[in-house]
């Protein structure tokens, strides 16, 4: 009889408890429930009420945030931003942050705010992080958003990028100054050439205007030397 109840050997605690529940005989006129043992009515009612309450809470809780992105990424800080559905009233947010492959978790929560971004600080450079975002409403918290993985840059890389930008700006300024100087030199040379050409044209006009007077003087001097006159006014004649 003992082997039939609990199998071979003595029955365990679960077997004895089941036997006690099943050995309780109902009152007169009450039918026995089917099976070896039926759940008590109170336990079934509590389970049903718990399921209904859980379903109601899940129906009223907000949806998970969408479009979760990480921007303004630096070696020791970053900014997480997200969006929520328009027809949902959200009064806060909760962010869980952890390193990849590390169980340590940082939890950031803020209520009575409508902001859609949060700054992450005290990050380690060249490290991968995972963040989840949850929306908070009066009914409770939403499910966690899709995980977002990001990696912080190295401080040396950030400084190198910054120095490269500064060098580029300086080179652009120097090139602009050189171009301005070259333009000024070209303009000065052009003005000088224009002045030289104008002076040459003026001298050429003066020489051209004086040329007829010189020709008249040359003709007059040539005529005087070719026909010499006598002191008395007559021409000299040779004696034969």
Swiss-Prot record:
Residue stretches spanning the membrane: 181-201
Biased composition (Gly residues): 1-10, 231-240
Summary of the tissues where the protein is detected: In adult, it is highly expressed in skeletal muscle, heart and brain.
Protein's UniProt keywords contain Plastid: no
Region (Disordered): 1-33, 210-240
Comp. bias (Basic and acidic residues): 11-24, 210-221
InterPro entries recorded: FN3_dom (IPR003961), FN3_sf (IPR036116), FNDC_type_III_4/5 (IPR052120), Ig-like_fold (IPR013783)
GO biological process: positive regulation of brown fat cell differentiation; response to muscle activity
Induction conditions: Up-regulated by muscular exercise. This effect can be mediated, at least partly, by PPARGC1A.
Record: glycosylation sites: 67, 112
GO cellular component, as recorded: endoplasmic reticulum; extracellular region; peroxisomal membrane; plasma membrane
Keywords, alphabetical: Cell membrane, Glycoprotein, Hormone, Membrane, Peroxisome, Secreted, Transmembrane, Transmembrane helix
Modification comment: The extracellular domain is cleaved and released from the cell membrane. N-Glycosylated.
GO terms assigned for molecular function: hormone activity
Matches recorded under PANTHER family: FIBRONECTIN TYPE III DOMAIN-CONTAINING PROTEIN (PTHR14470), FIBRONECTIN TYPE III DOMAIN-CONTAINING PROTEIN 5 (PTHR14470:SF1)
Entry text on domains: Fibronectin type-III domain is capable of forming a continuous intersubunit beta-sheet dimer; dimerization may thereby play a role in cell-cell adhesion or signaling.
Protein's name according to its UniProt entry: Fibronectin type III domain-containing protein 5
Organism: Mus musculus (Mouse)
